[in-house]
């Protein structure tokens, strides 16, 4: 039930391991930090990471007459979270489902979760363009969707897959809000200097080539990794870090669009 949700943002990646779930989680926390009520929906059925990243593993969800009730991270209900990870007994339990069952579960997540009034719903998707993505795009025809953010790393092999993701969005009619280049450079935890250990600016160049916004470049920062397993926002814990600066810019961009 998305009738109380004002804005829906989908987070995509062409390849796994680019930090999409971390970006989704920190984006949700940054929006909450900015005074918005936020929902975070994890539809990566085979690799749900959001419960771990927010330290919510072991949380139990229950159903009411209106559907599943999401997990709230605080008493004020400023961040609501839903994931298949809450339905698994153990984090290591695999989800061995064929396409139709995955489709049914995602439709339930999109239609049978009792979201309260939300300013933003962030949908964290699995990598690639699979049944999960097609189901989401079909459901978004019935519910207004602001668009998609694509997360990539600067290497050319990741950028090739991003091009496929861009084509997928165009064919399904989803607006592209921009590209985030993640893992671009390494921030030394001692001196905070940033060193490019991979190629750099691939996301910037691709955004320019396909004429969509480049939302920012996020480095590898061990200090940010330490925040995994908690509901602490980079904006609170590391306000002067490069990651915090980029997240502020993305939030400002989204707010301006919506």
Curated annotation (Swiss-Prot):
[4Fe-4S] cluster binds at residues 188, 191. The keyword Secreted does not apply. GO terms for cellular component: cytosol. Keywords: 4Fe-4S, ATP-binding, Cytoplasm, Iron, Iron-sulfur, Metal-binding, Nucleotide-binding. It is found in: Cytoplasm. It holds the Pfam family ParA. Its main location: cytoplasm. GO terms for biological process: iron-sulfur cluster assembly. Component of the cytosolic iron-sulfur (Fe/S) protein assembly (CIA) machinery. Required for maturation of extramitochondrial Fe-S proteins. The Nubp1-Nubp2 heterotetramer forms a Fe-S scaffold complex, mediating the de novo assembly of an Fe-S cluster and its transfer to target apoproteins. Heterotetramer of 2 Nubp1 and 2 Nubp2 chains. This is Cytosolic Fe-S cluster assembly factor Nubp2 homolog. It comes from Drosophila pseudoobscura pseudoobscura.
């Amino acid at each position: 039930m998305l009738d109380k949700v004002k804005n829906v943002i989908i987070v995509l990646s062409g390849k796994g391991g680019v930090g999409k779930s971390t970006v989704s989680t920190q984006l949700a926390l940054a929006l909450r930090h900015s005074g918005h009520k936020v929902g975070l929906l994890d539809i990566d059925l085979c690799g749900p990471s959001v419960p771990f990243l927010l330290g919510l593993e072991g949380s139990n969800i229950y159903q009411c007459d209106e559907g599943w009730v999401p997990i709230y991270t605080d008493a004020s209900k400023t961040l609501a979270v839903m994931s298949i990870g809450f339905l698994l007994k153990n984090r290591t339990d695999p989800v061995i489902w064929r396409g139709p069952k995955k489709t049914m579960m995602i439709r339930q997540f999109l239609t049978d979760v009792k979201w309260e009034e939300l300013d933003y719903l962030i949908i964290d998707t699995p990598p690639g363009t699979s049944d999960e993505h097609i189901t989401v795009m079909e459901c978004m025809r019935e519910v207004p969707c602001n668009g998609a953010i694509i997360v990539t790393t600067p290497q050319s092999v990741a950028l090739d897959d991003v091009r496929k993701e861009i084509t997928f969005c165009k064919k399904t009619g989803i607006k592209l809000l921009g590209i985030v280049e993640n893992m671009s450079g390494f921030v030394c935890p001692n001196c905070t200097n940033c060193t490019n250990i991979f190629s750099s600016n691939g996301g910037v160049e691709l955004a320019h080539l396909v004429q969509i916004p480049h939302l920012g470049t996020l480095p590898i920062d061990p200090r940010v990794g330490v925040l995994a397993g908690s509901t602490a926002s980079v904006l609170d814990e590391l306000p002067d870090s490069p990651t915090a600066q980029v997240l502020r810019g993305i939030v400002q961009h989204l707010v301006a669009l919506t």
